[in-house]
Curated annotation (Swiss-Prot):
Cellular compartment(s): Cytoplasm, Cytoskeleton; Cell projection, Cilium; Cytoplasm, Cytoskeleton, Cilium basal body
Protein known as: Probable beta-tubulin polyglutamylase
Keywords annotated in UniProt: ATP-binding, Cell projection, Cilium, Coiled coil, Cytoplasm, Cytoskeleton, Ligase, Microtubule, Nucleotide-binding
Coiled coil: 59-103, 144-260
InterPro entries associated with the record: TTL/TTLL_fam
GO molecular function: ATP binding; tubulin binding; tubulin-glutamic acid ligase activity
Species annotation: Tetrahymena thermophila (strain SB210)
Keyword DNA repair: no
Listed GO CC annotations: ciliary basal body; cytoplasm; microtubule
Chain's gene name: Ttll6a
Length: 1195
């Protein structure tokens, strides 16, 4: 059944019930008239004439006419009601019920009128009472009609004599009236019951309608889905039909071409594929199901069957081929249709945002997200699948760096600069020194223990007038650890505290101290966007305020207004009604401002002062916030990934001047009172609205990122903006934010950027805050810019010099983006030029020329910025002169580059070249700093000197028969040992080394030379004593002839090789002289290997080795069995061991590079240069002790 049918059903039932009630009432009225009529006849008596009967008949006719009129009126009213009900259809509200009740009361009044008319007609003498009753029970219109009828009746009768009789029967009529009233009451009760029944029926009717509506909605949805499916199928069929027709046309064209070639005279037959057409009256469009009926006949065949009989065979073949093609197309289309049907339709859910509340403990946050915004809540701390992340803790930069551009978090990294008391005090005190009048809203503060001495002076200055200080921990909340003091003895100089002057004259309300908790929304840090919520909290102390004295200095409930401290006081009054915000010890901000205004204070001026104080406080930390934000999200032009609700604590002094006490980056959102829940819930809701946390904004950001990625894929380059383009993009983004935020402010007011900032120059404050931040972090140090001469043509005309360090410098500058001043090339010492300098003196900065031989210092020409930079570099590097070595120009990089060249040459068969420096000096250097680069510069000169010495030594060692000169000396009965462990340094080589040193190493090398000379003298004395001991032993032993050694025409002598890598501490107890001699050589080398005895290699092994491969013995060749050596006595052996061990412990062996070992120093024919070792701790070039002292010798 439809809604209309159900409604008509109930309306017809109600109309039938009303008709039945009217009939019953008419019957009752007729029953009541008969006794009244008899009563009237009895009252009239026998004196009445016959005319009265005629009059009675007229009355009956009138009554019948009245009854008919009343019935017609009732019928008309019912018809009208039905019409109204049919027009309204579904108006079954309470208004219909009230109308029905009024209709029932009208009908009751009409029924009463009919009853009284019948009574009054029988009782002609009760006219006055009848009129009174009519006026009391009928409406005004019916009374007038009845009065006219009565007048007519009285004129016809003309009898007033019966009035006396009517008065006599007044009591009887009263009884009749009571009975009629009782009957009417019963009828009213019955009508009420019927009304209740009708109301129940109406409720059932409403429920049925709701059910029908829900069923209809389901049916409509199903119908819509069916229609969509049908339309999709129709479109698929159309597409298939079009494709098939196009295939048929192509087939026909191909057949035409083939027929024209073979038999051009024969006419082609037209064959059509006629799909089964299904007529749709709604769309009136031809549709097909995919079934084809191919007759193979055309119009030409029907008209010319007799003439074209020869063409039937060819047409049949063509039709068969076309049928086959059509069947193949059908199979393909059927497969596609089946594949489409098998695909599951994706049901797209309504997009909602995800709020991560895993790191918050406040239920009000979850309520706002779940109930107000209908968001999905997430409780996984490590998950990155969220849109808004709400946390109660500080945010690290790494977390912000991992976020996507559409995600948001409720904290800024680097907010410690405002939230920590020590950082806030440091920033505000710096600003106060520069702007003393503008930043005088923060109490004077000292940071202990750094400023303990300054704070101590405050007590010495104010001995006569003792001042009160409030002491706070650096990082605490809820008033923990705060106390007041007058004495310095209460403080420990080593503890970390923030000490402030106590405001001893605050503004009081009801004798209580109070402060404001203001909620400030920081919506962006670069540029700043600050909003202030119109409502806040006012927190009162619970004890009456008095000036600080010895008795109340420890009463924190008097001096502190923190809720966590005062809520446990028995005097604390909770506000249990949010509508009464001016009651208790926690009130609303607006109620207190209204109270101040009622007291006659200028609240508008106070509110402006508070806003300026908030802006200046945030500006002091703006550079820190901007740096952290940009480093994590450099391409976020909207500046909307972070937001933070800050809790500012503001106190008023006796002059209504606002003072900043502290800033809370995680204000409490606990809802202990209805006032808390009302204010904090609205604050969170409006802040999330203001930050545009919507699906629309999220999708816009995602689409923008997709466009950027598409451009990058197409162009193959990353989209880079110039500084001007970045400023334009930022300006556009901020304008877009302004348009949205101005429409969705809610309870917030934008206080920065301000429109009327004429009084305060905020840009000047921000510039100075940036300057303070750069000085604190060292970001203001700029690199020296290139000096450009007045005539740029001179630079272009100059020939280009090939200078490897300079080219490396250019590469370094391009990598780091810095610009260094042009640097003169280092000094280059060659053999032809000789020794740099004059008369062996080291060149000074004034003697250096501009041709690239030495380094030029320009201390006098540097400006202020350059001087600062040089001072910082000197302090950082620890060097004594302004001398910088490029990283690319370091010896290590040069060594590696040369080594790579050698490897490349070896790969193509070129003879391998080896560097003189040992690899351990770079690989085992923990500090990673290179050796002295100037040693490489004098390598050629030293090599030439070594070659000359080598030739001299070779002439001494060789004779005409290529025998060793030591064999001639062995024939003598007594010979002196020719094994020398030390050779005096050559003066010429010392001059070369001293003059090749750079000027910045002057003092270091002087110290090294002095210590080396001292160590050399001690070593000489020890070795002389060792030689004497050997001579004494030789004098006591028999003589043994020396083995003959043969020398090749070129290169080192061929003889058994003795390895001298054994420590003197492990000298074996043996009578063999070669072991003792080799042990002494092992003491020089300072390195100990696994074999405790001297290893002797064979001649074949030494012949196969090249000069550069002799590294294990460092080119040191000892000839064994030159003479017989007896073993030491035990006492002498112990003394020798102790002496050598002490020299090893004191690092007296192998330190000086000028010390050369043995007479056979250059026997190997190859020079190994001495490489100094760099020590980072001393930050200078020095020679470091190593396991292998022999690596510092030139063998």
């Amino acid at each position: 059944m439809s809604q209309k049918d159900i409604y008509n059903k109930y309306s017809n039932q109600s109309a039938d019930d009303q008709q039945e009630e009217d009939d019953d009432e008419n019957q009752e009225s007729s029953c009541q008239l008969s006794p009244e009529k008899d009563l009237g006849e009895s009252l009239q008596g026998e004196d009445l004439d016959e005319d009265q009967g005629v009059i009675g008949e007229d009355d009956e006719e009138q009554e019948e006419s009245y009854d008919e009129e009343d019935e017609e009126e009732d019928d008309e009213e019912n018809n009208q009601d039905q019409q109204n009900n049919s027009e309204s259809n579904l108006q079954y509200d309470k208004t219909n019920q009230k109308n029905q009740q009024t209709e029932m009361t009208d009908n009751q009044n009409e029924f009463l009128a009919e009853d009284y008319l019948s009574q009054i007609k029988t009782n002609e003498k009760s006219e006055l009472k009848y009129q009174l009753d009519i006026q009391s029970n009928l409406s005004g219109e019916n009374v007038q009609d009845m009065d006219e009828k009565l007048k007519q009746y009285i004129e016809l009768n003309g009898k007033n004599e019966n009035q006396q009789a009517a008065e006599s029967k007044k009591i009887e009529n009263d009884e009749i009236m009571k009975k009629s009233e009782e009957n009417v009451h019963e009828k009213v009760v019955d009508n009420n019951q019927k009304l209740n029944i009708q109301q129940n029926n109406i409720n059932d009717y409403q429920e049925d309608i709701k059910k029908d509506q829900s069923n209809n909605l389901v049916d409509i949805q199903q119908n819509n889905e069916i229609i969509k499916e049908v339309n999709s199928e129709d479109q698929q069929q159309k597409n298939e039909m079009d494709n098939k027709q196009s295939d048929i046309v192509l087939a026909q064209e191909e057949s035409k071409q083939s027929e024209q070639v073979e038999a051009p005279i024969v006419k082609q037959k037209k064959i059509e594929l006629r799909p089964k057409v299904i007529y749709d009256p709604k769309n009136d469009v031809d549709q097909y199901t995919g079934d084809y009926s191919d007759s193979g006949e055309s119009d030409e065949e029907a008209n010319n069957e007799d003439d074209d009989e020869d063409e039937d065979d060819e047409s049949e073949n063509e039709s068969r081929s076309r049928k086959n093609k059509a069947q193949l197309l059908k199979k393909k289309n059927n497969k596609k249709e089946q594949a489409k049907k098998q695909q599951v339709k994706k049901v797209y859910k309504k997009q909602t945002l995800v709020l991560n509340v895993a790191d918050t403990k406040y239920p009000v946050v979850k309520f706002v997200g779940k109930k107000i915004f209908k968001w999905k809540l997430a409780y996984d701390m490590e998950s990155m699948d969220f849109d808004i992340f709400w946390t109660d803790n500080a945010v690290q930069p790494e977390q912000l760096g991992r976020m996507q551009p559409y995600q948001k978090i409720n904290h800024f990294p680097g907010m410690f600069s405002l939230a920590r008391k020590n950082h806030l005090a440091r920033n505000l005190m710096k600003m106060r020194k520069q702007f003393p009048d503008q930043y005088k809203f923060f109490p004077q503060t000292w940071l202990l223990p750094a400023e303990y001495n300054d704070f101590k002076n405050q007590f010495e200055k104010s001995r006569s007038q003792q001042k009160i200080f409030i002491v706070k921990p650096e990082a605490s909340c809820q008033g923990r650890g705060i106390f007041l003091t007058r004495s310095l003895d209460d403080l420990n100089p080593s503890d970390h505290y923030v000490v402030q002057r106590y405001l001893n004259k605050p503004y009081l309300i009801d004798g209580l101290k109070f402060d404001f908790r203001l909620y400030v929304l920081l919506a962006g840090c670069d540029p700043l966007r600050i909003y202030l919520y119109y409502e806040g909290l006012t927190r009162f102390a619970t004890e009456k305020y008095q000036e600080v004295n010895r008795d109340n200095i420890e009463d924190m409930c008097m001096h502190l207004t923190n809720y966590a401290i005062n809520k446990d006081n028995p005097n604390f009054k909770f506000n249990k009604d949010k509508e009464k915000m001016d009651v208790g010890h926690k009130r609303s901000l607006t109620s207190v401002l209204q109270l101040l205004e009622d007291q006659g204070h200028d609240v508008n001026k106070l509110w402006k002062d508070i806003k300026r104080v908030l802006i200046k406080t945030i500006i002091s930390a703006q550079p820190t916030l901007a740096h952290h934000y940009k480093s994590c999200q450099p391409d976020n032009f909207m500046n909307n990934m972070c937001f933070e609700i800050l809790g500012f604590d503001i106190i008023l002094d006796s002059h209504l001047k606002p003072w900043v006490l502290e800033v809370n980056h995680t204000p409490s959102f606990s809802t202990d009172t209805p006032l808390d829940s009302y204010i904090k819930k609205n604050t969170i809701r409006d802040s999330l609205k203001l930050m545009n946390c919507t699906c629309k904004a999220k999708n816009e950001i995602i689409n923008q990122r997709k466009e950027i990625m598409q451009k990058r894929v197409l162009t193959g380059k990353k989209v880079k903006y110039t500084p001007e383009e970045k400023l334009e993009e930022i300006k556009k983004a901020q304008q877009k934010r302004d348009e949205y935020e101005d429409k969705h402010l809610g309870g917030f007011e934008r206080i920065f950027p301000m429109e009327d900032d004429e009084d305060d120059n905020f840009t000047e404050y921000m510039q100075y805050a940036l300057k303070c931040y750069e000085e604190q972090t060292g970001a203001n140090i700029r690199r020296n810019t290139k000096k450009v001469t007045e005539d740029p043509k001179k630079i272009t005309n100059q020939p280009k010099k090939l200078n490897q360090p300079k080219d490396l410098e250019k590469i370094y500058n391009t990598k780091i983006g810095a610009k260094l001043p042009p640097r003169k090339p280092n000094s280059q010492t060659t053999i032809n030029k000789g020794i740099p300098g004059q008369n062996g003196q080291r060149p000074s900065s004034s003697q250096l020329n501009e041709e690239g031989e030495t380094i030029q210092c320009e201390d006098q020409e540097q400006n202020k910025d350059e001087a600062i930079e040089n001072a910082i570099t000197r302090s950082a590097s620890g060097r004594m002169h302004d001398f910088r070595i490029k990283k690319q120009n370091s010896p290590y990089n040069i060594h590696q580059k040369f080594k790579n060249k050698i490897q490349n040459r070896v790969a193509i068969g070129v003879k391998e070249l080896k560097l003189a420096e040992e690899p351990f000096q770079f690989e085992e250097n923990i500090n990673g700093k290179p050796s002295n680069p100037n040693v490489k510069k004098i390598q050629a000169y030293i090599t030439s000197e070594k070659e000359q010495l080598e030739i001299k030594n070779m002439n001494i060692l060789q004779d005409q028969n290529y025998n060793s000169s030591r064999a001639v000396q062995a024939k003598k009965p007594q010979i002196e040992p020719q094994v020398l462990f030390v050779q005096e340094p050559q003066t010429k080589k010392l001059q070369i080394l001293n003059q090749a040193k750079p000027p910045q190493q002057k003092l270091q090398f002087q110290l090294i030379d002095n210590t080396a000379a001292q160590m050399e003298e001690e070593r000489r004395q020890w070795l002389i004593q060792a030689q004497r001991n050997l001579q004494y032993q030789l004098s006591q032993q028999q003589y043994q002839p020396q083995q003959k050694l043969t020398l090749l025409p070129k290169g080192p002598p061929i003889h058994p090789q003795t390895n001298v890598m054994q420590s003197i501490a492990d000298i074996p107890n043996s009578s063999n002289s070669k072991e003792i001699l080799a042990a002494v050589g092992g003491a020089i080398s300072g390195q100990y290997k696994t074999d405790k005895r001297v290893t002797i290699k064979q001649k074949g092994q030494i012949q196969n080795q090249s000069i550069n491969q002799l590294k294990d013995n460092n080119g040191l060749f000892l000839q064994p069995k030159l003479f017989e050596i007896q073993s030491f006595q035990s006492s002498q052996q112990q003394q020798a061991q102790q002496a050598i061990q002490s020299s090893l412990d004191q690092n007296l062996i192998g330190i000086n590079q000028n010390m050369v070992g043995l007479n056979d120093l250059f026997v190997s024919g190859k020079s190994h240069k001495v490489q100094p070792h760099y020590q980072a701790q001393q930050d200078s070039y020095s020679y470091q002790k190593h396991n292998s002292y022999s690596n510092y010798y030139q063998k």
